[in-house]
Every structure is written in C-alpha cells, then in structure tokens.
C-alpha cells in the first residue's frame, strides 16, 4: 500500500502509465510491433485531471471528444483545437501543414468571437480575419463530420477550398 498523493492516486501511477505506453510501438528485431489506442474517460470533462494529464504527457498524440460539440449534434465530436499529434508535422507535407494551421487558426478565431456573436456584440466589417472565420466556420465544422473519402490529397484539396475558395480555384 502506497500513500495516496496526487488526487488520491499513488505515486507509482505515473510510472505505471509510462510503462504501459512504452510497451507499444516497434518491438525488437523479429518480434513485431504493437499498435494501441488508449481510452481515458475523465470525470466532468476535466482534462486537467491527473490521469488525463499524465496520459497526454506520455503519448505522441491525443484526440479529445467534446460534450459541447456532441450536444450541437456534430459527430464525431472531436475537439480539433484541443486534440494534438506530435508526429503530424513530420508526417504531413509542407502545404498540408499550412492548411492544417490555417484551419486551426480559423476555428480558434471563431470560437473566440462566438460569445460576442451570441450576445449580438460583434460588428462585421471591423476585422477581416474575424469576418472570414464567421463565414467559413459552418463548412469547416461540417468538414470534420463528412464521410472519409479515403484519399488524403483530395481531402486536403477540399479543405483548402473551404478555407480559401479563390486560391483553391487558381490551383485547379
């Protein structure tokens, strides 16, 4: 019996989580690989809860599902801004990374403006980037829930078209 420490978790919890995560990945020569998807359910969607925080620190990436997004009726209810892949920048092409960055920036700006929109306090015409995020958000939000086409280049081309229709038209 260990003395409880972090929110009643014993100190060995961090080590145990790291050991489980370290067992996945490439095995020794001739032993095969282990691919794993870990699922962590947090109480009250508190992502700062110790186990969720530890897992985020150990793994290469995480997909955060949002109760608020699911209540809006969008599935999968992936919170794109809070989800992360540390490997993605190296796995994606430079153009794809630029599109991803623009997508995340546009969604983040919309989420920043959304309370002002709901309170009828936002005035269009004063901030071009804000106006663009308001105009593009519905299509960008729907993009996440569209059926997978199975072709990554076409998905990025479609996303680029949603973000900047003029630039996308010039490329075709």
Where are these regions (language model features)?
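P-loop NTPase catalytic core
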Residues: 1-172
């Amino acid at each position: 019996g260990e003395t409880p420490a972090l929110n009643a978790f014993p100190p060995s919890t961090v080590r145990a989580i790291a050991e489980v995560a370290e067992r996945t990945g490439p095995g020794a020569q001739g032993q095969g690989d282990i691919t794993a998807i870990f699922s962590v359910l947090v109480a009250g969607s508190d992502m700062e809860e110790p186990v969720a925080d530890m897992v985020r620190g150990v793994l290469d990436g995480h997909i955060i599902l949002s109760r608020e997004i699911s209540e809006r009726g969008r599935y999968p209810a992936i919170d794109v801004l809070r989800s992360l892949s540390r490997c993605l920048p190296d796995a994606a092409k430079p153009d794809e990374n630029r599109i991803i960055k623009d997508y995340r920036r546009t969604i983040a700006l919309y989420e920043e403006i959304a309370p002002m929109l709901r309170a009828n306090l936002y005035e269009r015409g004063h901030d071009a980037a804000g106006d663009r995020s308001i105009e593009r958000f519905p299509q960008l939000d729907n993009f996440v829930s569209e059926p997978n086409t199975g072709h990554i280049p076409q998905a990025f081309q479609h996303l680029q078209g949603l973000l900047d229709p003029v630039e996308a038209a010039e490329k075709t």
